[in-house]
Every structure is written in structure tokens, then in C-alpha cells.
Curated annotation (Swiss-Prot):
Superkingdom as given in the UniProt entry: Bacteria
Biological function: Cell division inhibitor that blocks the formation of polar Z ring septums. Rapidly oscillates between the poles of the cell to destabilize FtsZ filaments that have formed before they mature into polar Z rings. Prevents FtsZ polymerization.
HAMAP family with a match to the protein in the record: MinC
InterPro entries: CAP/MinC_C, MinC, MinC_C_sf, MinC_N, Septum_form_inhib_MinC_C
Keywords from the UniProt entry: Cell cycle, Cell division, Septation
A Pfam family: MinC_N
GO BP term, pick one: division septum assembly
Similarity remark: Belongs to the MinC family.
Gene name for this UniProt entry: minC
PANTHER family xrefs: SEPTUM SITE-DETERMINING PROTEIN MINC
Organism lineage string: Bacteria, Thermotogati, Thermotogota, Thermotogae, Thermotogales
SUPFAM superfamilies named in the record: Cell-division inhibitor MinC, C-terminal domain (SSF63848), Cell-division inhibitor MinC, N-terminal domain (SSF64043)
Protein name: Probable septum site-determining protein MinC
Quaternary state and interactors: Interacts with MinD and FtsZ.
Amino acid sequence: MTIDLIDFKMTKEGLVLVIKDYDNLEDVVNQLTSKISQMSGFFAAGDKIMLMIENNEKHSHDMPRIISILKKMGIEVSQILMGVTAKEGINVRGRMKMVEEGETKSGTKVVKKNLRSGQALVHSGDVIVIGNVHSGAEIMAGGSIVVFGNVKGILRAGLNESDSIVAALSMEPSLIQISEYILREAGSYDEPVVVHVKQNKIVIESAKDVKFQ
């Protein structure tokens, strides 16, 4: 029996796409494509919705692909919600507003601004930020992340490419993830550093001394 993983819920703030906890991303992609195709007359190009994935920490590595698929179908995600569904609607425990500014060149997203608490930047390729990533902000990238500034927020790189890196002019991040590897206590660095995976663990090295395998 096929389990419905996709649901749309209308709230006072707007339409929310709810993706239930899942085991196989392809099941989500297939149902999402089918559901939106059936609702083709409902959406207009550029429509914005909110996205909530149950157990979103578990599925954070899938976020860039899901948002990319929605964008290709003409739907923009305005916010990422953290919460659970309930009989009376949705219980939201947190939210991240999507950063819309920036341009994409050759698959790389370039954003020239500071990312504030409560803002999220999600892209399926590489990300370059010219500015600071403040505590409470989050970047999720399919490829590498380079920040020309200070990082105190959450960086998730290599969600599609395990050989990706993270680089910043200085950092004291809340969390760093590269592919399936997670570092929760990265420490503080007041010089340019490069973060990458070496011998199945995340390492942080001075940019002038970094050596890749």
C-alpha cells in the first residue's frame, strides 16, 4: 500500500507543503511531481509556499533537491518550517525565512549580504556568501560553501557531493555538516580556514596550510 507523503495545508499565513517522514527520497519526488501536476491549475508561476518536512533534521540533506524541484515547477519556497502536523493544523516550533537575493552563475549561488538569525539559504550547487553568517542563520548547499566573512551559524555542505568543502575568513559555527559527517563543536578561528573531510571525519585547517587527500 502506498503511503501519502505529500499534503498541502492552508494556514492563516498561507499555503504549507507538508512532507511526512520518509525513507526514500525518490518516493517523495515522484509523489510531489504527481501532486503538483494534478494541481497545475491551482498554481501560477512564481507562487510562494511554506515548506515543512517532518523530522527535518534527518532529511536536511534532501532540502536543496526538493526546493530545486519546486522551483523548476514554478513554485518558490518562502519559509522552511520546523514542526509537526496535528488534527487542528500545524504546530510550528521554528521557522527560517528563505534568502531570495543573489544570482546563480554556472551552478554557483552568489549572495552579497549578511545572513541574519532566522534566515536560510538553500541551493543545490555551490554557495558563495560575501558577508557574515550570524548565529541562528543556516546555509544548506549541495556543493561547497565559501563565506567571505565570519560564520557563527549552521553550515551544511556536500549534501550532493561528498568531496565538498567549507571555507570562511573566520568562524565559530554552531554546527558544520559535510555529506553525512557532522561536527557540533568546531571551536573558534580568527583566521581564514578550510573545513573538509579527511579519513572519515571533519577537520578544520588554516587556509595557508590545508592539504587535501
